[in-house]
Amino acid sequence: MQFPPASGSTQMQVQKLPTGIEGFDDVCQGGLPIGRSTLISGTSGTGKTVFSLHFLHNGIKHFDEPGIFVTFEESPLDILRNAASFGWNLQEMVEQDKLFILDASPDPDGQDVAGSFDLSGLIERINYAIRKYKAKRVAIDSITAVFQQYDAVFVVRREIFRLIARLKEIGVTTVMTTERIDEYGPIARYGVEEFVSDNVVILRNVLEGERRRRTVEILKLRGTTHMKGEFPFTMGTHGISIFPLGAMRLTQRSSNVRVSSGVPRLDEMCGGGFFKDSIILATGATGTGKTLLVSKFIEDACRNKERAILFAYEESRAQLLRNGTSWGIDFEQMEQDGLLKIICAYPESTGLEDHLQIIKTDIGQFKPSRMAIDSLSALARGVSHNAFRQFVIGVTGYAKQEEIAGFFTNTSEEFMGSHSITDSHISTITDTILMLQYVEIRGEMARALNVFKMRGSWHDKGIREFVITGNGPQIKDSFSNFERIISGVPHRVTTDERSELSRIARGVSSED
C-alpha cells in the first residue's frame, strides 16, 4: 500500500475562516472550518442571533466577504434595528449588496400549512442569493423555529440535512442557531440538530451566585483542533468579546527598570522601587492604609508626567478627591492636566467579564503607564472562585502584555493577626505583596507594614511601623523589641532574651 507524499497532508488539512469575533478565533485556533456548517446552541438570551450577525458583519467589513442571513423568527426590520445597537450599519451593507436578508419567518396570520413539508423552494432561494451576491458566509436563525412549525420531526431533520448538504456543496461557511432548554442539558431541543452539523458551539448564560455569567464552549470542531472548556464572554457596545485565558502565553518581556512607589522609605524596602512591569498587591484589613499607598503610587506617576488610571469599586470619585486632599494629593488637578483618569463603579453594577472589558477598553483608549484597582476583594463579592480567578488572570495578563505597572488592593476578613492571601487566587500571580495589619502595642493600636514578597529582587524582611499623617504615609523603624507581630499577639523581647539571641547569632557566625 502506497501513501501520499508528506506534502499532501498539508493540502488535506482543514482550512479555517476567521470569524473576526474577539477571542473566538483563539478558542477555535484560527476560525471556523471553511465550507462547513456550525451549530450555535444556547438557551434564550445567550446571544445566538448576535453571534451569527457578528459573524456576517465581520466577514463583510474586515474580509470583504458578502453574506446571507436567513431568518425564521424575527422580521428583517427588527434584525436591522437590533444590530444598530451594536454600532453595525447592516442597512448600508444591504444597500451595497454586501448583505442579503432572506425572510423565511412564519405567516403572522398563523395559517396552517397543508401538505408535506419540503424546503426545496427555500433551498433554491438561498442558492440563488448566494450566486447573485457571491456570498461566502451564511447564517440561519434558527432551525428550532422550523421544527416548531411542523410536527414531523424526522421529515424536518431530513430537509435540514438536505439544506446543509446543499450549502456544503456550494462551498459556503454556515452558522445556524438552535435553542436548548437547559444550560447543561441536551445540546438541542429536538435532539437531532447536532447530528446534521459538522461543528457545535454552545453559548451559556448561567446564574452564579447573584450574577449571570456568559460562557462559550466548542463541543465539536470536526477534523481540526480547538481549545477545550468554557470561556467567559460579554456582549458590549461592539458585539461579542470572548476572554480565552487558556490562549494567554507567558511571552511578555521583563523590565529591569524601576518605578517609585511614591513613598521613599518603601522604595528602600523594595530594593529601589517596583519593577516597571510588575503587579503589586497591598493586602490588609480595612483602614490599614491600602488606598493611601495606591494614591501615592498614582501621584508619583503624574508627578513624572506619566499617565495613570484608577478603577475604584468601593469609594465614589468625590470621596477619593476628599481623601486625597487630606493627604496632600490633588487628584482633581491631575485629571485637569490629562494625566489621571478615575473610573468609579459598584462591583454589582455588571458582571466580572463586563468589568474586565471596561478595564481593557479604558486602558486601550487612555494608554497609561500605571494602573490601580481598589479593590479586588470588592469585585469578588457574589461571584464564584473560578470566575474571580479568571478575572484576576485576565487583568494581570493584560497589564503585563501592555507593560503597565499594576497596583491592586485586597481587603482581608481578619481585623487582627495574620490572614491568608492564597484564598483570593492572586498570591502567585502578583510579583510584589505588601502586607498591612493592625498590632496592639502597649495598649495602643498601631499599623505594621511588611514586604511579604518581591519577585526577582532583594527586599527588606523587617516588619515596620506604618503611620498615616496629614502629609501622607510615614514608615518608621521595625518593631525590633517585639516578636510574633504577624500572628497578632506581639510579645516584647526582654534585654536578657536579646542578649541570648545575639550570643547565639555570634556563635553561629563563628562556626561558619
From Swiss-Prot:
Protein name: Circadian clock oscillator protein KaiC
Chain positions recorded as Mg(2+) 1 binding sites: T49
Manner of cofactor binding, per the entry note: Binds 2 Mg(2+) ions per subunit, one in each domain. Mg(2+) is required for hexamerization and phosphatase activity.
Catalytic activity reported: L-seryl-[protein] + ATP = O-phospho-L-seryl-[protein] + ADP + H(+); L-threonyl-[protein] + ATP = O-phospho-L-threonyl-[protein] + ADP + H(+); ATP + H2O = ADP + phosphate + H(+)
Post-translational modification Phosphoserine, affected residues: S427
Signal peptide: none
Species assigned in the record: Parasynechococcus marenigrum (strain WH8102)
Annotated function: Central component of the KaiABC oscillator complex, which constitutes the main circadian regulator in cyanobacteria. Complex composition changes during the circadian cycle to control KaiC phosphorylation. KaiA stimulates KaiC autophosphorylation, while KaiB sequesters KaiA, leading to KaiC autodephosphorylation. Clock output pathways impact the RpaA transcriptional regulator. KaiC enhances the autophosphorylation activity of SasA, which then transfers its phosphate group to RpaA to activate it. KaiB and KaiC together enhance the phospho-RpaA dephosphatase activity of CikA.
Residues of the KaiC domain: 1-243, 257-512
Domain remark text: In the homohexamer the 2 domains (called CI and CII) self-associate to each form a 'donut' layer; the compactness and local conformation of the domains varies over the cell cycle and impacts function. CII has the autokinase and autophosphatase activities, both CI and CII have (weak) ATPase activity; CI has the clock pacemaker role.
Annotated residues for binding of ATP 2: 286-292, 327, 447, 453-455, 457, 459, 461
Cofactor: Mg(2+)
Modified positions (Phosphothreonine) in chain numbering: T428
Protein residues bound to Mg(2+) 2: T291, E314
HAMAP family xref list: KaiC (MF_01836)
Domain of life according to the entry: Bacteria
